[in-house]
């Protein structure tokens, strides 16, 4: 593998991160439902609730590690190669730049948001964690999905002449 292979690696890491972000949200929402059932007397055993919280944590930690790997590969690639230009005209170019110009500022915002969300979770301050997560989750998910879309538009659907 060479540095030239990093765009596909980056897209793959973003796609994997997306899956774990979605999985983490599904598990925490299922955990909330289980918690409500325990509170309302429908369930007496809270082991299911703790299992869902643990699965949420595993998914989110995995998403964080995969995203950190992505950021490392992204910085290596962009340090080594110039920016790839989108060369198509018409509606593909309009859609590409709409996606790109929303992706970039949200990607920049996502790093501090993720940090501000993870730190309270590590410190077991879950109310503060939830307050930040309400903002972090949609931003992180959007950035992960649009990162894959940017790759697909640049290298697969509308590649410049001479690219793969």
List where the protein language model places each region.
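Alpha-helical membrane insertion/targeting regions
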Residues: 1-164
């Amino acid at each position: 593998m060479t540095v030239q292979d990093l765009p596909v690696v980056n897209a793959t890491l973003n796609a994997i991160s997306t899956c774990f972000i979605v999985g983490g949200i599904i598990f925490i929402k299922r955990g909330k439902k289980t918690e409500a059932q325990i509170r309302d007397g429908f369930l007496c055993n809270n082991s299911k609730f703790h299992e869902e919280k643990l699965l949420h944590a595993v998914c989110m930690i995995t998403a964080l590690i995969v995203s950190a790997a992505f950021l490392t590969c992204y910085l290596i690639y962009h340090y080594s190669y110039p920016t790839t230009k989108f060369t198509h005209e018409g509606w593909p170019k309009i859609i590409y730049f709409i996606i790109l110009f929303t992706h970039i500022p949200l990607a920049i915002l996502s790093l501090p948001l993720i940090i501000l969300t993870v730190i309270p979770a590590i410190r077991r301050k879950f109310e503060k964690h939830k307050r930040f997560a309400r903002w972090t989750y949609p931003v992180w998910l959007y950035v992960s999905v649009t990162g894959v879309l940017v790759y697909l538009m640049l290298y697969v659907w509308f590649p410049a002449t001479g690219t793969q």
